[in-house]
């Protein structure tokens, strides 16, 4: 079977390499340097399992810039292109997904398109009508950046937004590549599958916001946050997981998915979802005020990335803190080794960690790192448990 992947980010590569253990996979991208890296079996992103799989001889995987080469004779085309949230329209920008669909229908109308990109509720049904085809299925992705392939090898669940034989066939491709056995698999209608993805991420954002608000309360009243969280999480209905305070939820998925869900249901009475978005803003204000209370002349930002093991700093929570501090006229310097630029939002990047530590009066780090232990007295973090 020939499977094509459109988009070579975390979602595309993790799905492609999972399936390439047993089938021929072609990855399509528009960036020549990225395609060249992949054909040299070098990962363009930081992900241990992706890096390992690319080195394996039995992985039937190649990359191309040629959409005709990619789409011709493909049985399935997995669409994993970016759908950034557009604050002007309160909507995901789905233009890249729609462009892929147009190309696939022109080149290989028999191919079944599987949307892995996150899309608004109702998008798949609208695209079937727009392009006059039933060959579009939505299947949400549940993965962590930096552990994308791992999360496909050991998936928590598989959701396919169609109840059909071809949906079961695609689910079998994912199950075949996974190491985990007995994977919970759910077949739903397309719109319900889209809602599952957005509501799942919104719940995670709510949990982050909840423990952050608990931490803000404890900090304000001089209480021990760790003791409170440990006591609260002994209740098995709450559970001792995903409870480490932070600078707010961030990254590529949670901020845009909560806002999209809010926009999707603006005509439906709701309180919780809007409160989650507002709570995240309030948390960033609280953190910035706590840092400014130390009256630093220079604040050092240790890493822009959202979490350890990732090379992605899109919409990371620490950026919101940085912007609030800069707005008060405080100088900000940044240590971020994965960035090639010399500045970020008009703040200087310091590439030497020792010099960075010397120059900063306060170093802010969303998660504590071993290489900051020698200047622990300078570090401001709300990391209590050493986990994401």
Swiss-Prot record:
Pathway: Nucleotide-sugar biosynthesis; UDP-alpha-D-glucuronate biosynthesis; UDP-alpha-D-glucuronate from UDP-alpha-D-glucose: step 1/1; Bacterial outer membrane biogenesis; lipopolysaccharide biosynthesis. One of its GO terms (biological process) is lipopolysaccharide biosynthetic process. It comes from the Bacteria. Substrate binds at residues 141-145, 197, 201, 242-246, 250, 307. Its EC number is 1.1.1.22. The keyword RNA-binding does not apply. Keywords: NAD, Oxidoreductase. GO terms for molecular function: NAD binding; UDP-glucose 6-dehydrogenase activity. The active site is at 253 (nucleophile). Belongs to the UDP-glucose/GDP-mannose dehydrogenase family. This is UDP-glucose 6-dehydrogenase. It comes from Salmonella typhimurium (strain LT2 / SGSC1412 / ATCC 700720). The gene is udg.
